[in-house]
Structures are given as C-alpha cells and as structure tokens.
Amino acid sequence: MIIEIVGKFYDNHSLTIINRNIALILSENDNIDLYITPLDDYTPDAGLDKKVVKKLKDISAKEIDGNSYPDIQIRHSYPPIWQWPTDERTKVVYIQPWEYPKLPFEWQHKWETFADHVIVPSNYIRDIAVRGGLNPQSITVVPNGYNEQLFNKEEPKSLPYGIDSNKF
C-alpha cells in the first residue's frame, strides 16, 4: 500500500509533531510504502533530533514511480488543502483539529467534495462536524497520542515554581 502524508514535518507546531510521529511510525511498517510531501523546510531552530531529520529527509527524497499513485493521501495542515489528488483512485483522508463551536461553513461542502474520510481528535469536534452537516459515516475520532517517555507517571513531580496558588 502506498501512503502519502502532506503537511508540515520540521517545526514544533502541534500538527507538525503529529505528522512527524505518524510518518516515523508508518515508515517502520513493511506493508506500507510511505511518501511525505513537506509543506515546510527544515530549520535547525526547531531542535529536532538529527536521526529524525535524516529519516524524514530520506522519506521526502523518495518519488512515487510514474506508473503508481498513492492509495491513501493523508492531509494534515492548516488551512486544509482543498484540491484533487494527482490520481482519481487516491483516497483522501483529512486529519483536522478544531477549537471553536462551529466549523467554517465551506468546510462541510469541501470535505464532501475532496475527502473520502475525516479524522478528528475528539468527540467534541466530531459532534461539531456532524451538526455542520458532515455525514457521520465519513468521520472518525482518533485521539492525539502522547509520548510516554516524555510524560511518564513514574517521574518525580515537578518542583513548584514559587507561584502562590492562593492567587490563582
């Protein structure tokens, strides 16, 4: 299966971190031929691990054979990319967070036009999309993950920062 991810990969924005981790995990699956289309360039300011950058650069350097096409194109960016995939057989999946009580009006129509499926990180966003008119069968909730090496319950609690909790 050929999967392409379109989005940012090289900064520390929340969408970028998710894209980067999805790409790194999918790249380890022998049943997936992964390609990425970065919408950003690497900058050392992000402080990314050199091994991660090398892996992403190696993936982004790959080109899809002229006779092939992505089976699935995952789009995770803001604003969303509203365009047809390069091949009509490619299924387009949007990953789309949202933080407000209503989606932009045009998104419902554009998702119906361009998306084969939409993934959102919470039931709250799913409910907003469904209330906005999106077919409930075309949307799935997949919560954002966390890195248990960074957020480890066994680590000692953080030291207080000298903030008076009675004031807040």
Give residue spans per PLM region:
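Nucleotide donor/acceptor-binding cores
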Residues: 1, 90, 166-168
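N-terminal subdomain of nucleotide-sugar transferases
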Residues: 1-43
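Extended catalytic core of nucleotide-activated donor transferases of GT-like folds
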Residues: 4, 43-130
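Conserved donor-binding loops in enzymes that form glycosidic bonds
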Residues: 8-9, 97-98, 144
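Structural alpha-beta junctions
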Residues: 26-35, 115-117, 123, 135-138
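Hydrophobic residues at beta-strand termini and immediately following loops
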Residues: 37, 95, 142
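Acidic anion/phosphate-binding donor-loop and adjacent secondary structure
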Residues: 105-107, 145-168
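Helix-loop-beta element that forms the nucleotide-linked donor phosphate-binding surface
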Residues: 126-146, 153-154
